[in-house]
């Protein structure tokens, strides 16, 4: 993609439309450097205007849990452990510092030296983003443990929603180009979630933990993963992806629309095009990076990189002084490489012509018309899906290299035949699928005779169906079918006249059996393959009544099937009736526990406060006894202090255990509601979430199970 890519980076694959035509004759120039004289906490660096009519300055958190402000001799001491910081324009023409700790959110006004507000946040805050979300007013949004809070400049709670996992990074971006920004969040469960106001709109599955998100262009956001991958999305389509051995510290857009800055933890700073990832310029710092930010001084913007050792280096974009010369040299290098490749190819042809027939026979030549077939096969007895590779003319397969996103560890798999399989021309490679997602399998097959020192490489690409973990059962294998107890029922849409088209694309099924799904009536049993070999699936279709009933015990898989069906036939809205006895029973149990757990939490909180007050009182009395030289009473007070301290610790532990149980229950309840909403499509699915939240807020919990089963129209 870019001519000067370093060896550790590997470009993956990304066809994209031509992006904005920007001047690429630019470079990063170092303009300033200084030191904060403190070691800096990773990820805790911002740029903010802290005084009226002031300039932007760097604010960072030291490893000693102090907030350092450049050019100020004093630092801010926070008693709680700081996790993240941000800046928000809550002052009159200046910014306030937003501090996220392990138990609260603090808004601090440096200009007036006061705390604007402090709000308790259970389980702490891990990331911030400030801005306007949808129709809501501007606020600071705080990502925590499975929850997101929003606070305005007075500290009032203006937003709250639940997520499926911990929130590690967030950004605001106009995801669907409707003129309103959406909240994009990343989690350790490999998912990027997009929220429209307080309702989840889209889920994007990645291959590792999401570490950074940033809006970089209109309708486009960038992401980075824990394995060193960076890329961009426009809607649900990934535009490009690059993988590096280093990890990303920060991504942000810079000045012009379509440019993005990527700062790597090991010190590299890249200026890239957002639409294709091409590098315009690259520079570096000498030590590991804590974080980076964009700051303005007058009309100029600067990239400020802060290292872990406190050293700060600033860059700006300027027109390259030797850009035309560099381009000419790059073209010369490219043409020189092409010339070298052509000369090597010509040399091979010349050597070929000089070989005698006897030498060619000894060279174990492969026939010109050799072909390699790559297909999916199912071993019903072993309940296993395999990738079969077969070479024509009985040519031995000497090795297979498979690339597949998220399927193998490291995203690649190498098969080398053992000694007894050296001469085989047909091999089966087992595939164990953990997730329901469409995947491209890129294979490179190495062919050659056993004694040959030359191998022929043939490439092939196969699409792995989304629900390849299920295969249609024939009558003779009905013993492998387990009748599920859960099901959903919905009306067949007029657009879905031919279910066979969707089934053929989404499941592992023999092409000769696909047409059965277009018959007026039918029951079709699917067997689950490993590792889900104990989960069966059945379709009961009646085209005359225009109904479809799907039996399966896994609600997550059922939701994925419904969404895939609706997406294939472009169905905007769809109702369904769901029957999941175990799931609904679990939801009822959680709802019954909420009120008692809340009461216990309040009681434990009050008890803990009493214990803490008693400890403080005893400490004061003990110190007073020492001050008047009453050592016997002081000894008694310290003995009492030890007992009360142990009791306070026990009360705190009980409160923490109750809080953890409450959070887990609420997280599970939210997941159940989210899964049930995915059993519907469009507005009916969104109304499930809205109705359940309203029922909980109104203390009308008894109707929640009915909403989950029959929809929000009950």
UniProtKB/Swiss-Prot annotation:
Expressing tissues: Expressed in ciliated cells including amphid and both inner and outer labial neurons of the head and in both phasmid neurons PHA and PHB in the tail at larval stages L1 and L2.
InterPro entries listed in its UniProt record: Bardet-Biedl_syndrome_2_prot, BBS2_GAE_dom, BBS2_hp_dom, BBS2_Mid, BBS2_N, BBS2_pf_dom, WD40/YVTN_repeat-like_dom_sf, WD40_repeat_dom_sf
GO cellular component: BBSome; ciliary basal body; cilium; cytoplasm; membrane; motile cilium; neuron projection
Superkingdom, natural source: Eukaryota
Pfam family membership, one: BBS2_N
BP GO terms, sorted: cilium assembly; non-motile cilium assembly; protein transport
Chain segments annotated as transmembrane: none
Keywords: Cell projection, Cilium, Cilium biogenesis/degradation, Coiled coil, Cytoplasm, Cytoskeleton, Protein transport, Transport
Disruption phenotype: Mutants have normal body morphology, but with reduced body length and width, delayed larval development and decreased roaming movements. Defective cilia structure and function. Disrupted assembly of the BBSome complex at the base of the cilia.
Subcellular location: Cell projection, Cilium; Cytoplasm, Cytoskeleton, Cilium basal body; Cytoplasm, Cytoskeleton, Cilium axoneme
Coiled-coil intervals, chain numbering: 332-361, 597-627
Assembly mode: Part of BBSome complex, that contains at least bbs-1, bbs-2, bbs-4, bbs-5, osm-12, bbs-8/ttc-8 and bbs-9.
Protein purpose: Component of the BBSome complex. The BBSome complex is thought to function as a coat complex required for sorting of specific membrane proteins to the primary cilia. The BBSome complex is required for ciliogenesis but is dispensable for centriolar satellite function. Required for proper BBSome complex assembly and its ciliary localization. Required for cilia biogenesis and both the assembly and movement of intraflagellar transport proteins along the ciliary axoneme.
Designated name of the protein: BBSome complex member bbs-2
Species whose genome carries this gene: Caenorhabditis elegans
Origin organism lineage: Eukaryota, Metazoa, Ecdysozoa, Nematoda, Chromadorea
